[in-house]
Amino acid sequence: MAWRVLWNLSSCDAVKMTIIRDALSTLTNTVIVPHSGWNNSSFDDDHKIKFQTSLVLRNTTGCLRNLSSAGEEARKQMRSCEGLVDSLLYVIHTCVNTSDYDSKTVENCVCTLRNLSYRLELEVPQARLLGLSELDDLLGKESPSKDSEPSCWGKKKKKKKRTPQEDQWDGVGPIPGLSKSPKGVEMLWHPSVVKPYLTLLAESSNPATLEGSAGSLQNLSAGNWKFAAYIRAAVRKEKGLPILVELLRMDNDRVVSSVATALRNMALDVRNKELIGKYAMRDLVNRLPGGTGPSVLSDETMAAICCALHEVTSKNMENAKALADSGGIEKLVNITKGRGDRQVQGDGAQGSY
């Protein structure tokens, strides 16, 4: 009964941080960790298979889902809570392995992880980030340079460029500088997290789970940091792009919005951009007004699709031609004529509940 009370209280913004401060550690250590089965080999197989039906676990993950939407400080404290991220991901892995894709517990875990994946580039320690020039190296881009550069001390010799094996990863082979056995908060952005999210996107029929999984990939692939580049490559490696494209056809506004923004972020990777332009252009255009999509979409979702089209066609003539060939130009012009007093705001690169 106490867990239900906390679940109800956690929906009130005024007390969320109080619950996090006073009860998060207790909730994690007495419910989440033991009931998830993570780090507890004494649980028998029958418990591991049926744990997701636990009412206590369902209510507590629902409470965490609410708490994770309380803002930056809430996210930071939850990420640093020992065993929390590990247990939530363990629940998802176990449910995926037992083909339980649609339970409320899975939904709560996915939506909590989506929120904890929000703004990682800005909220994790600065030492983990890469600047734009380093990101160019990571993605294998050449930048003009000279062997030496002038400085106030004479000529400064250019640092030796790292080998491609040291600073690139395209989804194949070991990831440079990344732990093979991530723990805690590192599990949020480790490329191994991509596969369970994609499995849920392919198998779940729960719209909230689909939105949360797409939103997690959306958040993880946003921004100019190396792990976002790794996630984009991992999605391609796991053949996740066709899964995302198929969900564009779904008759659910919020799912389509998350998927469209995830595709926009995936297109920051040059190879992903080529694939999305080649195989997803018609699906994106079909969701614009006047297309053959199943329903009329909200302004927010339409903006997400427009942002995806912008990124996919940016600096890519073949994709721009595909947009024109699929009738996208006319539909975009009609949007501007019909809604001349409205503008698409921002790029929607990340989102949380």
Q: Where are the model-predicted features located?
A:
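Extended parallel coiled-coil rod domains
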Residues: 50, 180-203
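Leucine-rich repeat
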Residues: 13, 229-230
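Residue-level signal for cytosolic alpha-helical hairpin/rod architecture
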Residues: 61, 72, 194-195, 228, ...
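Extended, charge-rich alpha-helical scaffold/interaction domains
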Residues: 134-135, 353
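Eukaryote-specific, cytoplasm-facing alpha-helical/coiled-coil scaffolding segments in long proteins
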Residues: 88, 111-116, 135-146, 225, ...
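Alpha-helical solenoid repeats of the armadillo/HEAT superfamily
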Residues: 1-10, 17-22, 26, 35-69, ...
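Short glycine/proline-rich turn/loop motifs
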Residues: 43, 174-181
